[in-house]
Amino acid sequence: MRYSVIASKYVKALLIVGQKLNKIEKYGEFLSFVKNIYESFATFFNNPIVKPEQKTLVIKQAFEEVFKESPGEAFLNFINIVFENKREKFIPQMQALYKYAAIDIENKILVNVKTAVKLSDQEIKVINDFVEKYVGKTPVIEETIDESLIAGAVIEFAGKMIDVSIKGRMDKIAKEVFFLRKG
């Protein structure tokens, strides 16, 4: 997915505010919630007849209904500016960019783990310890289930890929056999 320059500028602004208010992680959760609301009610939020204040009010009411609290004036102002400037179509991009920028700014590292079955807490801890020792940053694990791996895992972080899956082993063996037959 190509991210727009517009979305990245909004994300940068929200990160600055989040850092000052010590709410980087909370704003990430809030932005994810706003993205879900936006995608569910895109017709309403993309309607030019609906005023930005009304859109912001709907977001605020949804927060109060789900979280039993307001997201705060700073976050609501951010959302209102997004609507005033007619940038709501960038909300999904903002959410994705924010997630990765927040991980970076907090000196963490994203670790993509693909497994055939859900990892146990102990397995996650082993991966966390390994990655932290390897790169010196706190890992943020994103787990994906891919039954085609049969067993094992594919771990990606810091530009590295470690494939310890059965499928990976079988592919490697198949390539070796293929090259032996060719030669």
From Swiss-Prot:
Gene Ontology cellular-component terms listed: plasma membrane; proton-transporting ATP synthase complex
Primary site of residence: membrane
Keywords assigned: ATP synthesis, Cell inner membrane, Cell membrane, CF(1), Hydrogen ion transport, Ion transport, Membrane, Transport
Listed InterPro entries: ATP_synth_OSCP/delta_N_sf (IPR026015), ATPase_OSCP/dsu (IPR000711)
Cystines in this chain: none
Compartment(s): Cell inner membrane
GO molecular function: proton-transporting ATP synthase activity, rotational mechanism
Claim: Cell membrane is one of the keywords in the record: yes
Membrane topology: Peripheral membrane protein
Pfam families: OSCP
Quaternary structure annotation from Swiss-Prot or TrEMBL: F-type ATPases have 2 components, F(1) - the catalytic core - and F(0) - the membrane proton channel. F(1) has five subunits: alpha(3), beta(3), gamma(1), delta(1), epsilon(1). F(0) has three main subunits: a(1), b(2) and c(10-14). The alpha and beta chains form an alternating ring which encloses part of the gamma chain. F(1) is attached to F(0) by a central stalk formed by the gamma and epsilon chains, while a peripheral stalk is formed by the delta and b chains.
Family statement: Belongs to the ATPase delta chain family.
Function as written in the Swiss-Prot or TrEMBL entry: F(1)F(0) ATP synthase produces ATP from ADP in the presence of a proton or sodium gradient. F-type ATPases consist of two structural domains, F(1) containing the extramembraneous catalytic core and F(0) containing the membrane proton channel, linked together by a central stalk and a peripheral stalk. During catalysis, ATP synthesis in the catalytic domain of F(1) is coupled via a rotary mechanism of the central stalk subunits to proton translocation. This protein is part of the stalk that links CF(0) to CF(1). It either transmits conformational changes from CF(0) to CF(1) or is implicated in proton conduction.
NCBIfam families in the record: ATP_synt_delta (TIGR01145), PRK13441.1 (NF009976)
Protein name stated in the entry: ATP synthase subunit delta
This protein's encoding gene: atpH
